[in-house]
Amino acid sequence: MQKEPMLEETYRKLSEELEQLKSVERGVIAKVIDEARELGDLKENAEYHAAKDKQGLMEARIAELTDVVGRAQVVDPSTFSHDRVSFGSTVVLVDQDTDEEVRYTIVGGQESNPQSGLISIQSPMARVLIGKEEGDEVELTLPSGKKTYDIEEILYEEITLG
């Protein structure tokens, strides 16, 4: 089982959601199913089928969260030196063709939000960046094609999740 790096805040939120689903929501759904079952014929009982569907979705979420929390490796990126790109690093890249500057922060898969500049450590882009130093040249494959960037800066900034 491969560990997945994760921020403490994310681990706490996922663990709380898992506990809520297991200790509260399961009981609520079971009660709704029992009440719907008492309404009679199960073949044409919309309330029963809706509750069973909801139960299936909830159990799938419980299984997913159990896996993610079980594989989590809580990491505090503020303790790293960030002289090389690593988990939690914010990387400032400069496009060699346009001199346009972009910033990405390497986070766990559960925390990624590419539109906000938070990229998963498992993403192809992060895999290229991990281990690189300031001044290194990297070639990234983007939706718009291949681009070459210079790593202008690697730093740690507190990570704010949405």
Swiss-Prot record:
Function: Necessary for efficient RNA polymerase transcription elongation past template-encoded arresting sites. The arresting sites in DNA have the property of trapping a certain fraction of elongating RNA polymerases that pass through, resulting in locked ternary complexes. Cleavage of the nascent transcript by cleavage factors such as GreA or GreB allows the resumption of elongation from the new 3'terminus. GreA releases sequences of 2 to 3 nucleotides.
Family: Belongs to the GreA/GreB family.
Recorded coiled-coil stretches: 1-28
Protein name: Transcription elongation factor GreA
Gene: greA
Annotated GO biological process: DNA-templated transcription elongation; regulation of DNA-templated transcription elongation
Alphabetical list of HAMAP family matching this protein: GreA_GreB
Origin species: Sulfurovum sp. (strain NBC37-1)
A molecular function (GO) term: RNA polymerase binding
UniProt KW keywords: Coiled coil, DNA-binding, Transcription, Transcription regulation
UniProt cross-references to PROSITE patterns, sorted A to Z: GREAB_1
SUPFAM superfamilies to which the protein is assigned, alphabetical: FKBP-like (SSF54534), GreA transcript cleavage protein, N-terminal domain (SSF46557)
Gene3D superfamilies linked: Transcription elongation factor, GreA/GreB, C-terminal domain, Transcription elongation factor, GreA/GreB, N-terminal domain
